[in-house]
């Protein structure tokens, strides 16, 4: 009876809610379209536009109604479950925390139990080689290996090739950094253009000659200045197999610090350029210079349709171990792959470098003699003291034997009789003389070797795919028996060391200012891409020529290319010359400005009530983002919105595919402010001081903050005005160890001598701080438990040995020393209705911890912001350490490229710097009961050197070069903003065996918190108050949120096949994230559910009709056979899938 009575009451409530909701929606329909006498002059046109909008609006109401019914159904299910579970305290979630915003109860998280199976199954249990195990096996003792210093002596029997000859492919290449010691443009002007020009001439001279090229950024720059004859010559060289484009990305990217969004984007940019200009599809990957290698890159290449890849920079001890076991060629499989769908055949180069002395065989003294650019009389020789000799009939026999001996020895490290011998180095084949020296001397050696049947060798120039095709053929017999001769490997190749204890973990943090700028650029680019495509389709629909004919798409293309260029392994890494860094920064800065314009223009068109009036507005009326950066090396500053009694529009964009309630903060000119929703409802506002200095309040600016509920990928309109009847809430301040002379309108309490503790709380957590303003403890309200979460700062110095830390290397002088201050820091505590925070001011870092009073995702984590300034220190690195009571032992977890989680072990047999790993978006530690996650809005180096600790290196200033070619230290430090979130989650019980798995997944809450932080809402104001301007209340392009575990990576307008303009198609890129279900999903405030990766196309969009949707390979290079329109999207966990979509 009790149950049925509850259902009766609940059913009645639902009926009322539905009726009231429908009434409100219909009422809002009228409110949205008031009569406007201004339109009477062009009545028919305006009326048509409005009629179309009304039809769209009714469709949306219908969709919303369906969504409400769906949510009610879920709520009934949830209610019945909660009744069966017994009564729950209604106070548990909402008992404390001033002003927490309650969410509608029907919008609770619903996870399909089938979606939990993936993470609960162990990943990659069928790998032959698991990198975590390899690190346990290797002793890392580094004995002298003889001529191959880091290896061992290689021997062979002369009859080993009697039955099957050795097949050698010599692959000429030139490694062209798009910026390092010179800028991209300077390298092109001085070197690269000559390589291309000579390539066309010299390859045509002899059809046996081959060459490979990787960086499309350079190829495209050259293509723009050459004539049609040269273009045809290049196409013909590719067609006859003499020239191969390898990888085909815009650059050869770093693999530690970039986010997968940018890795994919530069791959698409390169592949699209190749398709539109040359019509070629790369087959093999070539990564000889990135400083360590990520399985994320292997996955992306596989999904782009490449079948093979090559890597070079791997820890010398790992190379030796692989050489001993002949595992240098392997199928690289993702840790999470339960089958073999992600396998890609990978060749690891065995020796120290990709240069010629280290690629023909184990003895560099001999191999150097076969680099014919080093002949006597040239600009540089062989450091081993024996120069090359020009090949002639008198020495060809002895030289051929010497070279063949090296090839044979090298081949002993592999499982087949097919051998790769790269022939190149940085910016090689620049002079036409080198083409002659290398190709003519080698051809004489080849001709001689091939003529001697006793040598049992077949040798030739080849492309990378020539080599891999032969390798596949050698494995064919084994594969036909159902078992390849190559092992399966899972894991990654960080952290890289090229010799001794020289670990390349410094660059994980080097120049963090630009690492942060990179992520802001990514967020802006993605936001601009999505809004631009929606606006483009509406502009087509309403024939808005001003938008269609604008240069926005050209600017968008340039922004993609500038972001792509920055993913280069000497750019985002922070390992280029100072002026080259300025060049990269300037490119990013200019593109940021342009993207803000694209976002503003696109949003304006989409939110404009009468689309046909778009052409009549000047650009000054368009929406302007609230953040402005003055120069490439300064932090963004907020614009001040000038208020008056005349309302100003404030448009807020949610670039995420999830419905969200987020804080919106803008600066205004007056504290007496009112904010109204589009329907005229007043919005609760917190007014906070804008601080000109640590203890000086601005007299001209005030910060207003309010909660905004914004639809997925949508725009929400608010009105702000100055008003004496303001209902805003002023923040209160408590100051420790300092005081404010003029507090203005704010209540400020000065605490000079007090031992009183500092606390912050909301409805989820209570934080305790010490007198210095540093967090000491977190209490989770869900269970009332206190947890040690202790934040400290510390310094690393550099070793007293000859080799010291530099841009690449981290060589510390032992453990970090605590950050010591002479006078206690000034601490400022803010208590507000929307957020509260503690800010403490140290000499080198301004540290802010903030809690949001938002009942939802934003309220469950702790936001940490550090403004770091180490411009005056000498050979030091500053770190933030979080110490907790979590019993994590020596195990911790870091993400790879924001795509997947890689378990790590802190190994005592390795030096401290070897235990530092790259973190792109998150790192966590855990025990059987809890997980502590540090979410990051920028790539940095991270470690867990002791149980319960996470330490992140935030900036480094180093006075010397580390002897890796840069020839300078890092002394161009900026005032740098680092942004983090700390999330403490309760885990369901797990057994200890599960903790040893080679795979781990974040929780859904962690995933979405990371997305919220990396893709914040974007507030925009119209530049000038315009009384005649009318905007819709909102623009909501999706029918509902995408499933919780599906992320819209991009909606990227595809370039037209003719010219540089846009086509009508876009690349829809979706990522289904793997997540761990063993975390509480109650009260998370997620406005979505999971659907086993299924999305019905007809239920996807609201304002648009999907004209076509077809599957594609990741970078649009390939379409599956028999491709046709699909009506349902099906994504498997962890997969990133691209579709060609056309909307109208």
Swiss-Prot record:
Residues 1-5 are cytoplasmic. Glycans are attached at residues 78, 93, 1125. Residues 27-1144 are lumenal. The modification Phosphoserine is found at residues 80, 82. Pathway: Protein modification; protein glycosylation. It is an enzyme of class 3 (hydrolase). The active site is at residue 289. It holds the Pfam family Glyco_hydro_38N. Gene3D superfamilies: Glycoside hydrolase 38, N terminal domain, Glycoside hydrolase family 38, central domain, Golgi alpha-mannosidase II, Golgi alpha-mannosidase II, domain 4. It is found in: Golgi apparatus membrane. Its cofactor is Zn(2+). It catalyses: N(4)-{beta-D-GlcNAc-(1->2)-alpha-D-Man-(1->3)-[alpha-D-Man-(1->3)-[alpha-D-Man-(1->6)]-alpha-D-Man-(1->6)]-beta-D-Man-(1->4)-beta-D-GlcNAc-(1->4)-beta-D-GlcNAc}-L-asparaginyl-[protein] + 2 H2O = 2 alpha-D-mannopyranose + an N(4)-{beta-D-GlcNAc-(1->2)-alpha-D-Man-(1->3)-[alpha-D-Man-(1->6)]-beta-D-Man-(1->4)-beta-D-GlcNAc-(1->4)-beta-D-GlcNAc}-L-asparaginyl-[protein]. One of its GO terms (biological process) is retina morphogenesis in camera-type eye. One of its GO terms (molecular function) is metal ion binding. InterPro entries: Gal_mutarotase_sf_dom, Glyco_hydro/deAcase_b/a-brl, Glyco_hydro_38_C, Glyco_hydro_38_cen, Glyco_hydro_38_cen_sf, Glyco_hydro_38_N, Glyco_hydro_38_N_sf, Glyco_hydro_57/38_cen_sf. Belongs to the glycosyl hydrolase 38 family. Keywords: Disulfide bond, Glycoprotein, Glycosidase, Golgi apparatus, Hydrolase, Membrane, Metal-binding, Phosphoprotein, Signal-anchor, Transmembrane, Transmembrane helix, Zinc. Its EC number is 3.2.1.114. It is a single-pass type II membrane protein. Catalyzes the first committed step in the biosynthesis of complex N-glycans. It controls conversion of high mannose to complex N-glycans; the final hydrolytic step in the N-glycan maturation pathway. Its main location: Golgi. The keyword Transit peptide does not apply. Homodimer; disulfide-linked. This is Alpha-mannosidase 2. The keyword Cell inner membrane does not apply. GO terms for cellular component: cis-Golgi network; extracellular exosome; Golgi medial cisterna; Golgi membrane; membrane.
């Amino acid at each position: 009876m009790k149950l049925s009575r509850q259902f009766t009451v609940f059913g009645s409530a639902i009926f009322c809610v539905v009726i009231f909701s429908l009434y409100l929606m219909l009422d809002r329909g009228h409110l949205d379209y008031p009569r406007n006498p201004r339109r009477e002059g062009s009545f028919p046109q305006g009326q048509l536009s409005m009629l179309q909008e009304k039809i769209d609006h009714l469709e949306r109401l219908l969709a919303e109604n369906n969504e409400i019914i769906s949510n009610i159904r879920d709520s009934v299910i949830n209610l019945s479950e909660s009744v069966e579970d017994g009564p729950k305290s209604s106070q548990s979630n909402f008992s404390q925390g001033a002003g927490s915003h309650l969410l509608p109860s029907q919008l609770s998280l619903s996870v399909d139990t089938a979606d939990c199976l993936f993470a609960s199954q162990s990943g990659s249990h069928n790998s032959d080689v698991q990198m975590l195990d390899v690190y346990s096996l290797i002793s890392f003792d580094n004995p002298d290996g003889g001529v191959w210093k880091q290896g061992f002596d290689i021997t062979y029997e002369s009859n080993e090739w009697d039955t099957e000859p050795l097949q050698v492919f010599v692959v000429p290449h030139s490694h062209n950094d798009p910026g390092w010691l010179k800028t991209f443009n300077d390298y092109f002007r001085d070197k690269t253009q000559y390589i291309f020009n000579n390539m066309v001439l010299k390859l045509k001279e002899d059809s046996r000659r081959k060459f490979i090229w990787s960086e499309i950024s350079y190829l495209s720059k050259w293509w723009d200045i050459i004539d049609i004859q040269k273009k045809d010559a290049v196409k013909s060289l590719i067609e006859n197999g003499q020239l191969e484009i390898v990888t085909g990305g815009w650059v050869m990217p770093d693999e530690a610090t970039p986010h997968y969004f940018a890795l994919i984007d530069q791959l698409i940019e390169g592949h699209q350029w190749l398709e539109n200009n040359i019509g070629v599809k790369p087959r093999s990957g070539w990564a000889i210079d990135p400083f360590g290698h990520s399985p994320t890159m292997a996955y992306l290449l596989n999904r782009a349709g490449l079948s093979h890849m090559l890597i070079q920079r791997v820890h010398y001890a790992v190379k030796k171990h692989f050489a001993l076991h002949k595992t240098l060629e392997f199928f690289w499989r993702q840790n999470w792959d339960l089958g073999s769908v992600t396998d890609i055949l990978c060749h690891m180069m065995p020796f120290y470098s990709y240069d010629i002395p280290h690629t023909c065989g184990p003895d560099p003294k001999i191999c150097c003699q076969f680099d014919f650019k080093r002949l006597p009389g040239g600009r540089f020789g062989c450091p081993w003291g024996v120069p090359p000799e020009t090949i002639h009939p008198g020495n060809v026999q002895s030289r051929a034997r010497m070279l063949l001996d090296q090839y044979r020895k090298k081949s002993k490290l592999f499982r087949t009789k097919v051998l790769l011998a790269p022939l190149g180095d940085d910016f090689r084949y620049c002079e036409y003389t080198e083409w002659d020296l290398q190709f003519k001397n080698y051809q004489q050696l080849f001709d001689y070797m091939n003529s001697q049947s006793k040598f049992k060798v077949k040798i030739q120039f080849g492309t990378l795919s020539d080599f891999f095709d032969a390798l596949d053929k050698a494995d064919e017999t084994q594969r036909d028996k159902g078992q390849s001769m190559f092992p399966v490997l899972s894991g990654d190749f960080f952290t890289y060391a090229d010799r001794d204890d020289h670990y390349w973990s410094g660059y994980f943090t080097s120049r963090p200012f630009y690492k942060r700028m990179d992520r802001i650029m990514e967020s802006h680019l993605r936001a601009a891409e999505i809004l631009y495509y929606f606006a483009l389709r509406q502009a087509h629909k309403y024939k808005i020529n001003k938008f269609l004919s604008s240069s926005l798409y050209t600017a968008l293309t340039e922004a993609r290319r500038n972001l792509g260029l920055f993913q280069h392994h000497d750019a985002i890494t922070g390992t280029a010359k100072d002026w080259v860094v300025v060049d990269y920064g300037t490119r990013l800065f200019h593109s940021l400005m342009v993207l803000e314009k694209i976002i503003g223009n696109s949003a304006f068109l989409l939110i404009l009530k009468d689309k046909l009036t778009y052409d009549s507005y000047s650009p000054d009326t368009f929406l302007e983002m609230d953040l402005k950066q003055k120069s490439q090396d300064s932090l963004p500053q907020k614009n001040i919105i000038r208020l008056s009694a005349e309302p100003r529009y404030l448009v807020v964009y949610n670039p995420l595919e999830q419905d969200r309630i987020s804080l919106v903060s803008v600066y205004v000119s007056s504290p007496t402010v009112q904010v109204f929703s589009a329907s005229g409802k007043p919005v609760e506002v917190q007014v906070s001081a804008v601080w000109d200095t640590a203890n000086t309040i601005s007299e001209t600016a005030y910060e207003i903050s309010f909660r905004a509920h914004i639809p997925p990928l949508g725009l929400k309109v608010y009105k702000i005005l100055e008003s004496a009847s303001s209902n805003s809430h002023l923040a209160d301040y408590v100051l420790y160890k300092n005081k404010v002379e003029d507090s203005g309108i704010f209540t400020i309490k000065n605490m000079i001598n007090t031992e009183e503790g500092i606390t912050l709380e909301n409805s989820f957590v209570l934080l305790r701080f010490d007198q210095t303003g540093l967090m000491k403890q977190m209490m989770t309200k869900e269970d009332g438990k206190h947890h040690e979460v202790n934040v400290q700062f510390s310094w690393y110095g550099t070793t007293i040995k000859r080799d010291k830390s530099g841009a690449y290397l981290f060589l510390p002088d032992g453990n970090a020393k605590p950050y010591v201050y002479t006078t206690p820091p000034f601490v400022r505590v803010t208590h507000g209705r929307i957020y509260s925070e503690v800010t403490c001011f140290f000499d080198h870092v301004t540290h802010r911890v903030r809690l949001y009073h938002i009942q939802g995702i934003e309220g469950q984590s702790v936001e940490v912001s550090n403004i770091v300034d180490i411009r005056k220190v000498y050979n030091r690195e500053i770190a933030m350490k979080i110490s907790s009571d979590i019993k994590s032992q020596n195990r911790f977890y870091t993400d790879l490229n924001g795509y997947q989680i890689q378990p790590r072990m802190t190994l005592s047999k390795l030096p401290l710097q070897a235990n530092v790993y790259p973190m792109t978006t998150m790192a966590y530690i855990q025990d059987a009961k809890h997980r502590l996650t540090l979410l990051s809005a920028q790539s940095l180096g991270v470690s867990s050197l002791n149980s319960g600790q996470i330490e992140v290196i935030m900036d480094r200033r180093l006075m010397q070069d580390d002897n890796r070619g840069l020839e300078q230290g890092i002394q161009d430090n900026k005032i740098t903003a680092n942004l983090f979130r700390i999330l403490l989650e309760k885990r369901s019980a797990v057994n200890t065996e599960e903790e040893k798995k080679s795979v781990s997944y974040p929780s859904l809450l962690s995933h979405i918190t990371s997305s919220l932080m990396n893709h914040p809402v974007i507030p925009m104001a119209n530049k000038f108050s315009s009384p005649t301007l009318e905007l819709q209340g909102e623009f909501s392009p999706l029918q509902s949120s995408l499933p919780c575990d599906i992320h819209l990576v991009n909606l990227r307008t595809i370039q037209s096949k003719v010219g540089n303009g846009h086509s009508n198609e876009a690349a829809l890129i979706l990522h289904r994230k793997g997540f761990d279900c063993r975390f509480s999903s109650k009260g998370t405030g997620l406005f979505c559910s999971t659907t086993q990766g299924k999305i019905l196309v007809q239920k996807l969009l609201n304002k648009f009709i999907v004209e076509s949707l077809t599957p594609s390979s990741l970078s649009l290079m390939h379409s599956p056979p028999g491709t046709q329109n699909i009506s349902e999207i099906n994504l498997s966990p962890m997969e990133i899938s691209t579709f060609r979509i056309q909307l109208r």
